[in-house]
Curated annotation (Swiss-Prot):
GO terms for cellular component: cytoplasm. It comes from Shewanella baltica (strain OS155 / ATCC BAA-1091). The keyword Ion transport does not apply. This is Selenide, water dikinase. It catalyses: hydrogenselenide + ATP + H2O = selenophosphate + AMP + phosphate + 2 H(+). Mg(2+) binds at D57, D97, D233. Homodimer. Synthesizes selenophosphate from selenide and ATP. Binds 1 Mg(2+) ion per monomer.
Length: 352
């Protein structure tokens, strides 16, 4: 991972300039549903294959019978203190939505909000350079953008991608019998909250950063497995929230093996110190009625907001071995965390 090219004064800590952190500052699903409930007449475009109706990771527009264009945007406030790393994480997170649809990114433009009377422009320059670094790693140009004077630092991207329509994966197309796999461990919200609470040990500072800077490029290859029936990335709504979207969209119930859910190193240690982000509580308040009765420990893990989290994959039993081989080849632990079944209960997720 590249270091920031310019040394900043130790006194500049970006997380002290924001009230939220990363995807943990997302508006809750319940409130977002109210915001998106338009009062205008319905307008449709037959070439818009994926839009607001399905709560998916990105929009997809059909260009012709073979190719679709993917469009997405994502931005947030600082989740780490280092400007370059913040920009890199924000960009990595935004690009992830393209991979979550099974596509390939082709271009990005930047979104920057900056408190120009509080933080030097040179700090913003490093944030943008961090975004450029992530774009270069994804093989795309940061081709432009827009900036405003804002009370808190905000950075992200609008990303354009393309996809062969035969490879398109959505988050609401899972099937009964599918197995569930996760490509990154959970716990980013816990560890970044430990940093914000000044409880994070120096030797642990790399754990969440390394995870957040890892591009989900494997999504493009996963999508080529015909038995992968649904795909999404796990971000601000937590594992439970994004799993619920998958279940509700396909009218299925998930049997989740809680003890199999992979966790980042030291996540449980910092959870024991009370490092629970506010987004965890907002997530549970928003969708807890669709979950089984959970302990506080289970809530803290399943509802932990992830920033630049991994991919949640629903794969048929017949194609499971092919997915396992692919994950192994990319040095990702192929751990099955559950399965999807025809509903037998009013809740969408049960623990087993």
């Amino acid at each position: 991972m590249s270091d920031s090219p310019v040394t900043l004064p130790e006194s500049i800590k970006l997380t002290e300039y924001s009230h939220g952190a990363g995807c943990g500052c997302k508006i809750s699903p319940k409130v977002l549903s109210t915001i998106l409930a338009s009062q205008l007449p319905v307008f449709t475009d037959p070439n818009l294959l994926v839009g607001n109706q399905s709560r998916d990771d990105a929009a997809v527009y059909k260009l012709n019978d073979d190719i679709g264009i993917i469009s997405t945007t994502d931005f947030f406030m600082p989740i780490v203190d280092d400007p370059f790393t913040f920009g890199r994480i924000a960009a990595t997170n935004a690009i992830s939505d393209i991979y979550a649809m099974g596509g390939t990114p082709i271009m990005a433009i930047a979104i920057l909000g900056w408190p120009i009377n509080k933080l030097p422009a040179e700090v913003a320059q490093q944030v943008v350079d961090g975004g450029r670094q992530a774009c270069m790693e994804a093989g795309i140009m940061l081709a432009g953008g827009h900036s405003i004077d804002a009370p808190e630092p905000i950075f992200g991207l609008a990303v354009t991608g393309q996809i062969a329509l035969t490879d398109l994966k959505q988050n609401d197309t899972a099937k009964a019998g599918d197995r569930l796999y996760l490509t990154k461990p959970i716990g980013i919200g816990i560890l970044t909250t430990a940093q914000k609470q000044k409880k994070l040990q120096d030797e642990d500072s790399h754990i969440a950063v390394n995870a957040m800077c890892q591009l989900n490029t494997i999504g493009t290859t996963i999508a080529k497995i015909s038995g992968v029936n649904a795909l999404t990335d796990v971000t601000g709504f937590g594992l439970a929230g994004h799993l619920l979207e998958m279940c509700q969209g396909a009218k299925l119930t998930a049997k989740l093996k809680f003890d199999a859910v992979p966790l980042l190193p030291r996540a449980l240690d910092y959870l024991a110190l009370g490092c629970v982000p506010g987004g965890t509580h907002r997530n549970y308040d928003s969708y807890g009625e669709h979950l089984p009765e959970l302990s506080e420990h289970q809530k803290a893990i399943l509802c932990d907001p992830q920033t630049s989290g991994g991919l949640l994959v629903a794969v048929s039993a017949e194609a499971e071995a092919e997915l396992i081989d692919l994950l192994d080849a990319h040095h990702i632990a192929p751990i099955c965390i559950g399965s999807l079944e025809t509903p037998t209960t009013e809740v969408n997720v049960v623990l087993c």
